[in-house]
């Protein structure tokens, strides 16, 4: 009886580990697909506008209004 209970517990632990690792690997794969997919690469090019070093006249006016 003790052996059967131990085997059951070990089986449950291994099954839980497998199901959690499957979910983690699935999320990692989704992230990789979103980064290297066509839409993902196009979306990354939009981030270049965020790091533009130039300040436009509208930005300067907005900063003056805030101050």
Curated annotation (Swiss-Prot):
Main location: secreted
Residues carrying Phenylalanine amide: 36
Propiece residues: 40-67
Keyword line: Amidation, Antibiotic, Antimicrobial, Antiviral protein, Cleavage on pair of basic residues, Membrane, Secreted, Signal, Target cell membrane, Target membrane
Cleavable signal peptide: 1-23
Domain of life: Eukaryota
Tissue: Expressed by the venom gland.
Location of the protein in the cell: Secreted; Target cell membrane
Presence of the UniProt keyword Aminoacyl-tRNA synthetase in the record: no
GO CC terms in record: extracellular region; membrane; other organism cell membrane
GO annotation, biological process: defense response to bacterium; regulation of defense response to virus
Similarity remark: Belongs to the non-disulfide-bridged peptide (NDBP) superfamily. Short antimicrobial peptide (group 4) family.
Functional description taken from the UniProt entry: Amphipathic peptide with antibacterial activities. Shows antiviral activities against the herpes simplex virus type-1. It potently inhibits the initial infection by provoking the rupture of viral envelop and the dissociation of proteins from the virions (EC(50) is 0.43 uM). It also effectively inhibits viral attachment (EC(50) is 2.87 uM), viral entry (EC(50) is 4.29 uM) and viral proliferation after infection (EC(50) is 7.86). Morever, it enters mammalian tested cells (Vero) and reduces the intracellular infectivity.
Protein name, per record: Peptide Hp1036
Gene source species: Heterometrus petersii
Phylogenetic placement of the source organism: Eukaryota, Metazoa, Ecdysozoa, Arthropoda, Chelicerata
């Amino acid at each position: 009886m003790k052996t059967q209970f131990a085997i059951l517990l070990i089986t449950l632990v291994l099954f839980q580990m497998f199901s959690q690792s499957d979910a983690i690997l699935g999320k990692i794969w989704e992230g990789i697909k979103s980064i290297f997919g066509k839409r993902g690469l196009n979306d990354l090019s939009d981030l270049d506008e965020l790091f533009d070093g130039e300040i436009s006249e509208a930005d300067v006016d907005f900063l003056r209004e805030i101050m």
